[in-house]
Amino acid sequence: MAIRSYRILTPDTRNRSVSGFDGRVQLDPQKKLTSGQHHCGSRNGRGIITARHRGGGHKRLYRQIDFRRDKEHISGKIVTIEYDPNRSAYICKVHYKNGDKMYILHPRGVMIGDTILSGPKAPISIGNALPLTNMPLGTAIHNIEITLGKGGQLARAAGAVAELIAKEDRSATLRLPSGEVRLISENCSATIGQVGNITANNRSFGKAGAKRWLGKRSEVRGVAMNPVDHPHGGGEGRTPIGRKKPVTPWGYSALGKKSRKRNRYSDASILRRRE
């Protein structure tokens, strides 16, 4: 999946590039596998911004993705590989032998016409989903469950991949894409392989409007604000922040401060923090 650049016809196409994939099919999504979304522009019931730099964007239909992969021992055929505006990865439409149709994340290397399988007896092949206890050490995996039966929650972005590095005492040790090493029940399932569209991070938007299409608003520097809006604000002309260290709009340290809450339930499962 190479990066596709634009011809320089206007200033916004000078540096713009997108992910290109010849095998992707440009089709409307399966209507029964979509649902509407309500966007609140990151405002709560009183109209107050609760998450900055979000709002606007193109209307989207949510594609219902099968993160559980619980169609055990029922083979499915990859029919299409489609674009999903709600995530960086592509998705596949799967037709199962029992007549069901589902969307799944597109594993790297899986093409239209390939067959996938789920369940404890599924072979070790890219796109198949099975419990961690049935996988050999060193297997590359994605869409990993944390809670048994809840569905995959880890390693779902484009190009994401984790590694199974150990199994002991009914627990599996995984190295996650962030570099974190943690324990997960070996009964939890995962999908073999790496998520596709590995060049998603190499694309260049080319203009601010391309980010507005995605629902991302611009960020304003604190020193450009008034003192009422940010601790860095105020002063005559171009002035420094007036502090030893940068802070957030709420006065907390902005660089190097650990933001994870103490005594979380998952602390005992994390063997090494992320890098």
UniProtKB/Swiss-Prot annotation:
Cellular component GO terms, alphabetical: chloroplast; mitochondrial large ribosomal subunit
Q: Where in the cell is it found?
A: Plastid, Chloroplast
Where is it mostly found?
Answer: plastid
Could you tell me the keywords of this UniProt record?
Answer: Chloroplast, Plastid, Ribonucleoprotein, Ribosomal protein
Positions of region (Disordered) = 224-275
Judging by the UniProt lineage, the source's domain of life is: Eukaryota
| A GO BP annotation | mitochondrial translation
Q: Enumerate the GO terms in the molecular function aspect.
A: rRNA binding; structural constituent of ribosome; transferase activity
PANTHER family referenced in this protein's UniProt entry, alphabetically: LARGE RIBOSOMAL SUBUNIT PROTEIN UL2M, RIBOSOMAL PROTEIN L2
Q: Which family does it belong to?
A: Belongs to the universal ribosomal protein uL2 family.
Q: How does it assemble?
A: Part of the 50S ribosomal subunit.
What is the name attached to this protein's record? Answer: Large ribosomal subunit protein uL2c
Give the organism, scientific name. Answer: Picea abies
